[in-house]
Amino acid sequence: PSALARFNPDGSLEVWLPNQAPDMFRTDIAKRTGLDPAQITVHSPLLGGFFGRHFLYDSASPYPQAIALAKAVGRPVKLIWSREEEFLRDVLRPVAAVHFRGALGNDGWPVAIEAISATEGPTEAIAGKQGEKLDPSALEGLAGKSYAIANKRIAQRYVKGPAMLGYWRSVGNSLNDFFYESFLDELADKGGKDPFELRLHLLRDNPRLTTLL
């Protein structure tokens, strides 16, 4: 992570920083400096990848330090964090424990599935959600599956974790798909089915996905 800050002779401020939401960052910089947003220019370098990393996380960006240093020394400051500092201060992926239950018909095919995720989700970290803490992104990979299972229940139980979370690439899918597919393998074993044949059966009305398989 890096940032460059420069105060101009007219009192305006220019900041160069990788980001996914320039207006959001400019508003935050205005709060930190007391400047009018019209005095602040945020330059968004067209380089690298974002992958959910460059949002407005509380401790995971060096631009507040670059601005403070530029103001203190009266000259432009470019700040680059070491890899050690980046990993110490950065956000993490969502973490969850998911409890699954399922039911099989007399023919061994799944007829019901329940997945309850004990997790926080990253939306609270970026948006400061108040009151309602449920986060749809935390259930990605559990909800919205194409498998033709007649009875489904997908739920989140809010559990606050010790670390600040962020929207790293694929968010909920990065863990929940593994959980869900592993449980399907268990259902296949319990029902005496081949895991591949079970998936073909559950996707039998979806030619696109059966072709993909």
Residue ranges: model-predicted function:
Residues 16-18, 43-45, 80-82, 105, ...:
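Generic beta-strand/beta-sheet core signal
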Residues 47, 84-86, 120, 205:
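Residue-level marker for beta-strand->alpha-helix junctions and adjacent short loops that shape enzyme
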Residues 75-81, 110-112, 195-199:
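Acidic/polar loop patches that form or flank catalytic/metal-binding clefts of enzymes
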Residues 3-73, 126, 130-142, 167-207, ...:
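Alpha-helical support elements that line or immediately flank enzyme active sites
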Residues 1-3, 95-182:
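Glycine-rich loop/linker segments at domain edges
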Residues 30, 57, 93-94, 150:
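Short, glycine/charged-enriched secondary-structure capping and boundary segments
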Residues 24, 86-89, 120-124:
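Short, well-ordered, mixed-charge alpha-helical segments that flank or form enzyme active sites
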Residues 77-100:
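Structured beta-strand/loop patches that form or line metal/cofactor-binding pockets in enzymes
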